[in-house]
Amino acid sequence: MATVTAALVKELRERTAAGMMECKKALVEAEGDIELAIENMRKSGAAKAAKKAGNIAAEGTIIIKEEAGVAVLLEVNCQTDFVAKDSGFLGFANEVAEVALAERLNDIVALQAKFEDARIALVTKIGENISIRRVQLVEGVALASYRHGEKIGVVIAGEGDAETLKHIAMHVAASKPEYVNPSDVPADVVEKEKAVQVEIAMNEGKPQEIAEKMVIGRMKKFTGEVSLTGQAFIMEPKKTVADILKEKGASVSNFVRLEVGEGIEKAAEMSFADEVAAVQKG
C-alpha cells in the first residue's frame, strides 16, 4: 500500500476544496494516486449530486453584473437560507454571472452545462442541492440596476438620468409590474380578466349589458396595475410612473425583475410532532 503523505492530502485539498478526511480517504482508496483520487471523487460527487437533485432548492441569491450597455441577472438556488449566505456558494454564483456577462450567455441550458462540474463539486462540499435556475441579459442605451438584499434584482433599460432610472428600478422591485405599458398587456390576458370581471358584476345582480359597461373602467384599472407606467409611483403615490418619466424626460424600454424562489412550490414545514416521528423512523 502506497504511503499517503500530508503533502499529498494538502495538494488534493487545494485541487478539490474537499475536507481533509475526505481527501485522505480518497487517497488511501486510490493507493496514493492523486489523479485517480480526483477521478473517484468526481464520480462520487456526481452520484451525491444526483441524489440531492430531487430536493427543493427555493432559497439562494440574485446576482447582477454590468458593463457598458449590457447587464446580466442570475438566479442560483440552494435549499436553505444558511447556505445562501455561504462564501463558497456566493463565490460560485458570482463566477457564473461573470462568465454569463463576458460571453453574453442568455441560454440557461448552455450556462448550466458549462458549470456542471463546479456545481457537482459544490453540492458535494456543501451537502445541498444547488441549481443555476435563471439567467437574463438586458441591453440598452442606459441601464440602471437595483438589488434588494440578496433576494430581488432588477435591471431597467431605457433613456434618462441615472438617478431617475435607479428610482424606477426600486419601484419595480417593490411593485412587481408585469409589463412596461398598459398597451403591452396581451389580448388574451385582457380577455380572461374581462370575463372574470363581467361574471363578478353579474353575480352582484347587474344585467349583462350594464356589467359590460362597468367592466370598461375596471379593465383600465387592471391594465394600469399590472404595467409599470400605469402604476402609482412608490415615492410619489399621487403620480403614476408615466408622469414621473415625462417630468424627467426619461423612458423605459424594458425591465427584468427576478426574485429568489418565485414559482417554486416549497414543501410544507413539518410540525414538531412530524419531526419527532421522522427521527424515530430513522
UniProtKB/Swiss-Prot annotation:
Keywords: Cytoplasm, Elongation factor, Protein biosynthesis. Its main location: cytoplasm. Transmembrane segments: none annotated. GO terms for cellular component: cytoplasm. Residues 80-83 are annotated as: Involved in Mg(2+) ion dislocation from EF-Tu. GO terms for molecular function: translation elongation factor activity. Pfam families: EF_TS. It is found in: Cytoplasm. Disulfide bonds: none annotated. PANTHER family: ELONGATION FACTOR TS, ELONGATION FACTOR TS, MITOCHONDRIAL. Associates with the EF-Tu.GDP complex and induces the exchange of GDP to GTP. It remains bound to the aminoacyl-tRNA.EF-Tu.GTP complex up to the GTP hydrolysis stage on the ribosome. Belongs to the EF-Ts family. This is Elongation factor Ts. It comes from Aliivibrio salmonicida (strain LFI1238). The lineage of its organism: Bacteria, Pseudomonadati, Pseudomonadota, Gammaproteobacteria, Vibrionales.
